[in-house]
Amino acid sequence: MLEISNLSFSYGRRKPLLFQDFSFGLQPGVVYGMLGKNGSGKSTLLYLMSGLLRPKSGTVQLNGVDVALRRPSTLQEICIVPEEFDLPRVSLRQYVALNAPFYPRFSNEILRRCLDDFDMDDSVRFEELSMGQKKKAFMSFCLAANTSILLMDEPTNGFDIPSKSQMRKVIAANMSDEKSIVISTHQVRDVENLLDHVLLIDGGRKLLDVSCSQIAERLFFVEQPLS
C-alpha cells in the first residue's frame, strides 16, 4: 500500500522544513484520522501523499511506485477531496462522463447511493451549489471512483449537523477491506466514530501513531463519587 519513508519537505529553499525524516504507512481496510490544529502540516502531508507536492527528500510510494512521478497507473488509485476547491461550470453528470473513465473501478451504483444519501442527484450544476453541496457532490464522485486510497481534508467544514451525519453514513457504507481512507481534521468529534487509527501531528512531527483499539486498551476508568 502507501508508504512514506524519511520524508522531508519545505515550501522553498530558504523556508524551514515542515517535515523532516517523517515516516508513516497506510494499510488497507483502515480509516485513519489525521489530527492536529490548524497549521500543523495536515494538508501538506495529504498533498504529498497524493503526488500534488514533491518531497525535498525521501519518498512516498504506492505499491512500490513513487507517487511524485504521477504515473496514470498510480494516480488512478488515489483520490483527494481538498478542503477548498474549484469545479468547472458543468453538471455533475457531465463531470462524471469526462472524468470517470480515468478510474477503472468507477461505480455508477456507488455514485447513485452516495447522492441519494446526500439528497442530491447528478443533474446538479456545480456553479449553482454552495461550498458544502459541492463538497458532497465531489465526495460522492471520489467514493464512486473506488480508488484504493481516499484522502479527505477537513471534510466536515461547511457542513451543518445533519450534513455531518449524512457524511458519516456515506463513508461508513462505502468503506471496504481494499480501501484506505485518511480523514484530516481538527474537529475530531465529527468523525471519531469512523476512525480505526489515529495519527496526531504538530509542527510536522508525529505525536501519536496508534490504532483506536490500542488507545482503548490503555485507558483506565476510575469511578469518582458524585459531589
Predicted segment positions?
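A short, flexible loop at the N-terminus of ABC-type nucleotide-binding domains that lies
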Residues: 1-4, 8-21, 28
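The feature captures the beta-strand-to-loop junction immediately N-terminal to the Walker
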Residues: 32-37
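Helix-to-loop junction immediately C-terminal to a conserved catalytic motif
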Residues: 50
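Conserved ABC transporter NBD signature motif
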Residues: 58-69, 73-74
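ABC-family P-loop ATPase nucleotide-binding domains
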Residues: 80-137
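Catalytic Walker B motif of ABC-type/P-loop ATPase nucleotide-binding domains
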Residues: 150-154
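Helical segment within the ABC ATPase nucleotide-binding domain
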Residues: 164-177
